[in-house]
Amino acid sequence: MKKMFRSLIRHCLKPELDKLRECEERLSVIEKQKQSSKQESEETYIHIETLNVEKVDYHLEFGELTIDELSGRLNIGATYYIPPEEKDKKCQRKPEAPSTPAVTIRSKRQ
Protein backbone atom coordinates (compact mmCIF):
# COMPACT_ATOMS: atom_id res chain seq x y z
CA MET A 1 0.00 0.00 0.00
CA LYS A 2 2.84 2.35 0.84
CA LYS A 3 4.53 1.60 -2.43
CA MET A 4 1.39 2.18 -4.35
CA PHE A 5 0.73 5.44 -2.58
CA ARG A 6 4.32 6.60 -3.25
CA SER A 7 4.13 5.72 -6.91
CA LEU A 8 0.82 7.56 -7.22
CA ILE A 9 2.26 10.68 -5.59
CA ARG A 10 5.40 10.51 -7.75
CA HIS A 11 3.33 10.07 -10.86
CA CYS A 12 1.03 13.03 -10.05
CA LEU A 13 3.66 15.38 -8.67
CA LYS A 14 6.49 14.66 -11.11
CA PRO A 15 5.31 17.17 -13.77
CA GLU A 16 4.85 19.82 -11.08
CA LEU A 17 8.30 19.14 -9.63
CA ASP A 18 9.83 19.37 -13.10
CA LYS A 19 8.12 22.73 -13.67
CA LEU A 20 9.34 23.95 -10.28
CA ARG A 21 12.94 22.92 -11.06
CA GLU A 22 12.74 24.64 -14.44
CA CYS A 23 11.46 27.84 -12.81
CA GLU A 24 14.28 27.72 -10.24
CA GLU A 25 16.86 27.34 -13.02
CA ARG A 26 15.41 30.25 -14.97
CA LEU A 27 15.35 32.39 -11.83
CA SER A 28 19.01 31.62 -11.11
CA VAL A 29 19.94 32.57 -14.70
CA ILE A 30 18.06 35.88 -14.37
CA GLU A 31 19.78 36.63 -11.03
CA LYS A 32 23.20 35.98 -12.60
CA GLN A 33 22.37 38.32 -15.49
CA LYS A 34 21.26 41.00 -13.05
CA GLN A 35 24.49 40.75 -11.05
CA SER A 36 26.64 40.88 -14.19
CA SER A 37 24.73 43.93 -15.47
CA LYS A 38 25.42 45.75 -12.19
CA GLN A 39 29.13 45.03 -12.51
CA GLU A 40 29.27 46.03 -16.18
CA SER A 41 27.32 49.28 -15.89
CA GLU A 42 28.28 51.61 -18.71
CA GLU A 43 29.12 55.27 -18.27
CA THR A 44 28.74 57.36 -21.37
CA TYR A 45 30.85 60.48 -21.88
CA ILE A 46 30.16 62.92 -24.69
CA HIS A 47 32.92 65.25 -25.88
CA ILE A 48 31.86 68.14 -28.14
CA GLU A 49 34.71 69.63 -30.16
CA THR A 50 32.81 72.27 -32.10
CA LEU A 51 29.36 73.76 -31.81
CA ASN A 52 27.87 75.49 -34.83
CA VAL A 53 25.08 77.98 -34.17
CA GLU A 54 23.20 78.80 -37.35
CA LYS A 55 20.89 81.52 -36.07
CA VAL A 56 20.75 83.61 -32.90
CA ASP A 57 17.53 85.48 -32.25
CA TYR A 58 17.49 88.33 -29.73
CA HIS A 59 14.06 89.52 -28.75
CA LEU A 60 14.12 92.84 -26.89
CA GLU A 61 10.89 94.52 -25.86
CA PHE A 62 11.14 98.26 -25.30
CA GLY A 63 7.37 98.77 -25.23
CA GLU A 64 7.35 99.06 -21.44
CA LEU A 65 10.37 101.40 -21.27
CA THR A 66 9.37 104.85 -20.00
CA ILE A 67 11.59 107.91 -20.18
CA ASP A 68 11.11 110.71 -17.62
CA GLU A 69 14.07 112.84 -18.64
CA LEU A 70 16.16 112.57 -21.76
CA SER A 71 19.73 113.72 -21.32
CA GLY A 72 23.09 112.17 -21.99
CA ARG A 73 23.17 108.92 -23.86
CA LEU A 74 21.60 105.52 -23.45
CA ASN A 75 24.03 102.63 -23.73
CA ILE A 76 22.54 99.18 -24.07
CA GLY A 77 25.11 96.46 -23.68
CA ALA A 78 28.85 96.86 -23.27
CA THR A 79 30.28 100.07 -24.72
CA TYR A 80 33.96 100.85 -24.61
CA TYR A 81 33.88 104.31 -26.20
CA ILE A 82 35.31 107.23 -24.20
CA PRO A 83 34.82 110.73 -25.67
CA PRO A 84 38.10 112.53 -26.41
CA GLU A 85 37.32 115.32 -23.92
CA GLU A 86 36.97 112.89 -21.04
CA LYS A 87 39.99 110.94 -22.19
CA ASP A 88 42.16 114.09 -22.13
CA LYS A 89 40.92 114.94 -18.62
CA LYS A 90 41.83 111.51 -17.32
CA CYS A 91 45.30 111.62 -18.89
CA GLN A 92 46.26 114.99 -17.37
CA ARG A 93 48.08 114.74 -14.07
CA LYS A 94 47.45 117.07 -11.21
CA PRO A 95 50.46 119.20 -10.30
CA GLU A 96 52.08 117.77 -7.24
CA ALA A 97 52.92 120.06 -4.34
CA PRO A 98 56.48 119.79 -3.11
CA SER A 99 56.59 117.11 -0.55
CA THR A 100 57.87 118.69 2.63
CA PRO A 101 57.52 117.06 5.97
CA ALA A 102 54.89 118.47 8.29
CA VAL A 103 56.63 119.80 11.38
CA THR A 104 54.93 121.06 14.51
CA ILE A 105 57.08 122.77 17.12
CA ARG A 106 55.74 123.24 20.63
CA SER A 107 57.43 124.57 23.68
CA LYS A 108 57.38 122.88 27.00
CA ARG A 109 54.97 124.23 29.55
CA GLN A 110 56.49 125.07 32.87
From Swiss-Prot:
Compositional bias annotation for Basic and acidic residues: 85-96
Coiled coil region boundaries: 16-46
Source organism, top-level taxon: Bacteria
Keywords linked to the UniProt accession: Coiled coil
Positions of region (Disordered): 85-110
The protein, known as: Uncharacterized protein YocL
Organism: Bacillus subtilis (strain 168)
Gene expressing this chain: yocL
